[in-house]
Amino acid sequence: VVETIGLPNRDLFIFCDDTDYCLRAHIAGFSLYYIPAALMDKHKFFSSDTWTTRNQKKKWKRYYQLRNETYMSHHYGQNWGVRHLRGFVMLLGYWIPALLSMPFTNAWTMSDLPVLWRAYRDGIEEKLGKR
């Protein structure tokens, strides 16, 4: 696989690098196998945190998640809706709860909203890499 499609895309920092690699392998004609019994041992980063604390801790990851998922939809999408709207719906999925919770918690601030917009735009424009 590596000789045919190369290594995973390191510019998809944290999110979607595995999905992109599988899509590229599939497009190149390789078979993919789903192993439902496979396990991943993740560190319990949020185990005893409140909702507000969890949101604050993962704020920096949201940019990459939104950007990379928007990139995947834009890059591999087969129609305009997938290429442009899927990422925008995800953006709204962050904006709306943020706006609704701001008066009651400090998990979100107004300065978070432009960062999320930039993540969406960077995904559409296929600007990847660590930021």
Describe every region a protein language model picked out.
Residues 1-7, 11-39:
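A short, conserved alpha-helix in the catalytic core of glycosyltransferases
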Residues 72-74:
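A bilobed periplasmic-binding-protein/Venus flytrap-type ligand-binding module shared by bacterial periplasmic
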Residues 78-131:
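Non-catalytic, C-terminal membrane-associated alpha-helical segments of glycosyltransferases
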Residues 53-63:
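A short acidic, glycine-rich active-site loop
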Residues 35-54:
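Active-site donor/metal-binding and catalytic loop motifs
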Residues 4, 51-55, 102, 106:
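A short, mixed-charge helix-start or loop-turn motif at secondary-structure junctions
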Residues 66:
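Active-site Gly/Thr loop motif
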